[in-house]
C-alpha cells in the first residue's frame, strides 16, 4: 500500500479522496491555486502545496507544477479525481516517467477510450452494441450530410475528442446540419484542440444508463450495477439515481455483462464507467462512451452496493487484487444524488460565485450523505465549476429515497450566493419524476420551459 498520495484536484472530490486515504492510513498532499488558499481540502490534507494562480490553466492543469509538488513531497501516487487532468493521457505518461503511480487506467487505454471513434470501433470488436452512425471521423459538413442521409434524421453531432457537453448538437433536418456542424466543430476545436466530429442517429425516447466497473491489475473485472442519469440540462447531469427503474433483472445482467466486456477488451485497470443509451421503445441499449475516471455521481453506487469506490481505486493502483467477485455484489435499496450548484436558475443558470455567509447542510437519519467542501465564510472562486455540494440519500425503495431527498433539500440553507437548491426541490417533487416518467429530453423540453415561465 502507498505511504503518501497527492490529490491533483480541488473541491468536494479532493476532500472525498483525502478522507478515503486517511481511513486507509495513507498520508495526503493537497495542491491548490492562490484562489483556493483557504479551501477545505488544503486544511484537511497532511501537506498542501501552492501550484499557481487562480486560472485552472496555470494551476490545476499545470502538469509540471503538479509533478514538481509530488516529487518535492515524495508522494508515491497521484489521484486525479474528476475533471482537470483526470483523463489526460499525457499526464498519466509523465507520472509514469517520474516513477509516480497514476491512480487510474494506463495512458494507452485513455487514448483508445478517450477518442470516441476509436472507442466505437473497439466496442464493435468486443460485441458491445453501438448506436448507428458514422464509421469514422467526419471533417466536413458535406461528409456529415451524406452520413445523415444514410442513417436518417434526427442525428446527433458529437466531437470526437469531446466531453462535458461540449461540441454536441442535435440536428432535426438537413437544412440545419451545415450551420450546426460548423458551430460544433469550432467549439470542439476551441475546447479540445480537435475539430473532428462524428454522427449518431438520435435514439428517442431514451434513458442515459451508465454502468460502474472496477478492474484490477490481474485482469479481474466486475460491475457494481447501473446509474440512471437521464435528467440532464445541456447534456450535463443534474440528478442521478441507482438502480434505474427502467431496467429489469434480465436487462440489468445483459448491460452489466456488456460493460465488463468493454473493459476487458481494452485491458482496463481501476474504476471506470461505461455509458449507454437505452431505447425505451425497443428495450435495446447502445454504447455511448467510457469515462476513464471516478464519476461525480459515484456515491449513489456506493450506497446501493456497499463498495467504497475511491478506496478500491487506491487499493487497485497499489497492486492489490479485487477481493470482490461479481456474485458478491448485491444491490440493496435505492439511492439518489442531487448536485447543488452556485448558479441562478432564474438567469439561465448563470454562475453565482461569492462568499457563503450562512450554511446549514442537512443531516440526521439513516442513509443521508453530503459531499461538500464549503463552510460558513468560504468564498467560492469564479474560476471553476459551480458545483459546491452533492446531497446523496439511500432508502429501502425509490419512494423512500425521494421523500428523504425532499426532506434534505428542504433543510438545506446556503446564504450569500444563489444556488439551484429550490430548483432541485421542485424537480424531485414533480409528479412525473416521482412516477419515473421521464427520459433524456424531459428536463430541457418538458420541465424547464414551464419552470422558467413560473419563475
What are these regions (language model features)?
Residues 34, 54, 108, 136-139, ...:
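Short, solvent-exposed coil/turn elements at secondary-structure transition points
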Residues 1-125, 138-146:
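ATP-binding N-terminal substructure of ATP-dependent carboxylate-amine bond-forming enzymes
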Residues 7-24, 48, 71-73, 96, ...:
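ATP-dependent carboxylate activation and anion-phosphoryl transfer catalytic cores
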Residues 29, 79, 101-103, 131, ...:
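Structural detector of well-ordered beta-strand residues that form the stable sheet scaffold
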Residues 47-49, 111, 129-137, 168-169, ...:
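Structural signal for short hydrophobic segments within the conserved structured cores
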Residues 147-156:
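Acidic/histidine-enriched active-site and ligand-binding environments that engage anionic O-linkages
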Residues 135-148, 241, 314:
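A short, flexible low-complexity segment enriched in Lys/Arg and Gly/Pro that occurs
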Amino acid at each position: 500500500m502507498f505511504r503518501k498520495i497527492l490529490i491533483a484536484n480541488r473541491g468536494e472530490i479532493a476532500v472525498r479522496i483525502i478522507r478515503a486515504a486517511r481511513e486507509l492510513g495513507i498520508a495526503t498532499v493537497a495542491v491548490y491555486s492562490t484562489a483556493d488558499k483557504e479551501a477545505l481540502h488544503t486544511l484537511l490534507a497532511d501537506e498542501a502545496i501552492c501550484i499557481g494562480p487562480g486560472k485552472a490553466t496555470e494551476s490545476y492543469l499545470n502538469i509540471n507544477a503538479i509533478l514538481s509538488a509530488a516529487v518535492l513531497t515524495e508522494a508515491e501516487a497521484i489521484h486525479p479525481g474528476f475533471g482537470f487532468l483526470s483523463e489526460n493521457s499525457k499526464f498519466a505518461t509523465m507520472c509514469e516517467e517520474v516513477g509516480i503511480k497514476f491512480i487510474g487506467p494506463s495512458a494507452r487505454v485513455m487514448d483508445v477510450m478517450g477518442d470516441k471513434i476509436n472507442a466505437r470501433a473497439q466496442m464493435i470488436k468486443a460485441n458491445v452494441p453501438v448506436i448507428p452512425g458514422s464509421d469514422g471521423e467526419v471533417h466536413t459538413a458535406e461528409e456529415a450530410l451524406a452520413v445523415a442521409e444514410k442513417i436518417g434524421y434526427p442525428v446527433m453531432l458529437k466531437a470526437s475528442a469531446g466531453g462535458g457537453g461540449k461540441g454536441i448538437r442535435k440536428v432535426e433536418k438537413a437544412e440545419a446540419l451545415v450551420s450546426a456542424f460548423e458551430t460544433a466543430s469550432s467549439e470542439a476545436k476551441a475546447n479540445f484542440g480537435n475539430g473532428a466530429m462524428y454522427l449518431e442517429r438520435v435514439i428517442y425516447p431514451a434513458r442515459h444508463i451508465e454502468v460502474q466497473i472496477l478492474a484490477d491489475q490481474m485482469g479481474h473485472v466486475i460491475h457494481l450495477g447501473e446509474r440512471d442519469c437521464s435528467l440532464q440540462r445541456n447534456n450535463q447531469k443534474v440528478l442521478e439515481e441507482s438502480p434505474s427503474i427502467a431496467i429489469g433483472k434480465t436487462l440489468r445482467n445483459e448491460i452489466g455483462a456488456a460493460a465488463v466486456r468493454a473493459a476487458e477488451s481494452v485491458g482496463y485497470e481501476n474504476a471506470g464507467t461505461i455509458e449507454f443509451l437505452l431505447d425505451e421503445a425497443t428495450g435495446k441499449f447502445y454504447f455511448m462512451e467510457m469515462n476513464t475516471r471516478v464519476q461525480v455521481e459515484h456515491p449513489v453506487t456506493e450506497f446501493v452496493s456497499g463498495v467504497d469506490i475511491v478506496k478500491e481505486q487506491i487499493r487497485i493502483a497499489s497492486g492489490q487484487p479485487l477481493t470482490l467477485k461479481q456474485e458478491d455484489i448485491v444491490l440493496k435499496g435505492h439511492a439518489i444524488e442531487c448536485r447543488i450548484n452556485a448558479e441562478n436558475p432564474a438567469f439561465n443558470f448563470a454562475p453565482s460565485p461569492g462568499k457563503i455567509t450562512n450554511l446549514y447542510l442537512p443531516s440526521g437519519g439513516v442513509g443521508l450523505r453530503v459531499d461538500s467542501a464549503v463552510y460558513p465564510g468560504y468564498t467560492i472562486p469564479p474560476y471553476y465549476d459551480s458545483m459546491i455540494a452533492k446531497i446523496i440519500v439511500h432508502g429501502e425503495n425509490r419512494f423512500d429515497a425521494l421523500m428523504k431527498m425532499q426532506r434534505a433539500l428542504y433543510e438545506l440553507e446556503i446564504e450569500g450566493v444563489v444556488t439551484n437548491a429550490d430548483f432541485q426541490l421542485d424537480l424531485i417533487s414533480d409528479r412525473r419524476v416521482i412516477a419515473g416518467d421521464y427520459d433524456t429530453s424531459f428536463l430541457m423540453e418538458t420541465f424547464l420551459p414551464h419552470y422558467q415561465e413560473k419563475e
